């Protein structure tokens, strides 16, 4: 694996995106096949991928939860997580900055809670 220095952190150039995870046959967009996803995460980690990217709206909000569970058995210092604030989807431009900041903070806290399984 090739790595890059990102502000002193060693990140794999290849990341694991979670916008399109495998689904359970016949299921809906939030019905992620957790076993197959865990196998994919294990394969990625075994081959040096250490950067995982997810976001609030992926798979109806389930992407963060499933990736969090797939990574729970790995040393937390061995990988990097990115989740994103979907401001364009949950913001209202009529709100002032304080409301936007509160919404952003809430979305980030929610994402990290789903990724870690902790509230």
Where are the regions that the model predicts?
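A short, structured active-site edge motif that brings together acidic residues
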Residues: 77-91
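Glycine/proline-rich, positively charged
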Residues: 93-119
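Generic enzyme active-site microenvironment
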Residues: 51, 82, 119
